[in-house]
């Protein structure tokens, strides 16, 4: 009965992770387009500029992982003090800023900062609040509820 009460909350958490997976796919599948946008000459695949452009996109993706690593340690404490709902909303707001940054920036440095912030949004905000929220909303089988998060991240790879 309790899971039914929190069904929309669980679905919102799942869809947050769907956007997380989409972010990673968008960056990796459009690396040439992003490199062009960030000012790299991507006309000759054999040139050093082409390789530098691809490296810049890879760097932005790598900063996502670093943002996760840095923020995962304090996210749970913040979630306990501030509340899960506020952290989920804050993570969504950070993701919106990151997507806008990736979309409009002309700088690989700004894109790397956006990557870092998206990592913070994922681990520091969403992981710290979404995982416990899903577990608490479905106490009968919390492991299965958490598997739903991984399922939605996986589905995002097919979208």
Identify the residue ranges that each predicted region occupies.
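Small-residue-mediated transmembrane helix hinge/kink sites in multi-pass secondary transporters
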Residues: 32, 73-77, 132
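Extracellular/periplasmic helix-loop-helix junction of adjacent transmembrane segments
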Residues: 30-69
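Hydrophobic core of transmembrane alpha-helices in multi-pass small-molecule transporters
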Residues: 110-125
